[in-house]
């Protein structure tokens, strides 16, 4: 395989999907050496088969707003690869959603799910509908209209969606209710469900907790304790909230949180009471992060900016893709950050990743460090299949073990000659090899 040539060919075929091309171009060079050790991969054109989704579903979603006006949005489901298990990946409701973004997410999800060691393929879906500013009734009607089409393409052994940006417990509940009404079946066809109807304990916390568990494993390779470390966190949604919670539990000090309008910096640190306020603000009141300074006036709010120029020890980007550019990465390194663990999907631009790696700081890509969410989704699928509910302690112990296993695989495949652990290479090679071997064993399908 010539990785550069494959990327150029894909650019020509998909010129209007920059996020997808970015994801592929970041992965292929890191697996090129390992791929070329296996001539049978090239014979069966494995890399092109892995890069291009099995199936791309596009559909119209028509719904009625509270004023009686008919609205139309686009719906998507990218079923990328099911070589190691049923398609698995979240649904994103955000105005930025398009085919290129979802193809990048589905591609990344395939590697991430492989890393978990659980039998799950890769997928992603969603819509350019945004729940922000919509009434609860409007969100319900949209979710029902979305499921009216999606239900034909999913199932507990076929494709199991979950939540993502804009799709939380409320939306998953509406989607599941409509699926049940349409099919007359109560199945584990969605994960992230409420506890009373088949959800798993620790699922809301899993991505944030898992990111911090992975971070502590990274720090341990250099005999560094997380206790007392100052942490920059972006985002204020599910991932950011529970990453902050786990940091607090382990003695670290969250200093920032953000949303799409700007970020807050609290020089005193965000303690338990302050985090509870943020959770109430974002999850119940659906407010904006700038309201934090009204409650805690010693904090500062920066409109339209991101938190990466602040001084701290650790950075946890937990908001969205491409949120750290080269200048921001250089500022993080200059200001003494020793570790960056991605809680979001592909939040660091390629030039930012290069700066982190050139500086030899600890850096992990999202497919490794944020795999806790889909890991517990897999555990939710297991509980649904068994008709059992595990305790929070049981699920959390599974999560810790899975994140530790992912870290060990990254170290195995990513340790370089000078001892530096290239987590990007390690995660990509480890995830790729499992999927590649499964695809080879199953023939040209």
Where are these regions (language model features)?
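Glycine-rich phosphate/diphosphate-binding loop of Rossmann-like nucleotide-binding domains
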Residues: 191-194, 199-311
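Flexible, glycine/charged-enriched surface loops at secondary-structure junctions
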Residues: 21, 37-44, 117, 154-163, ...
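Adenosine-phosphate binding glycine-rich loop
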Residues: 2-23, 218, 333-445
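Glycine/serine-rich phosphate-binding loop and adjoining beta1-alpha1 elements at the start
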Residues: 94, 113-227
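Rossmann-like adenosine-cofactor binding region
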Residues: 262-363, 368
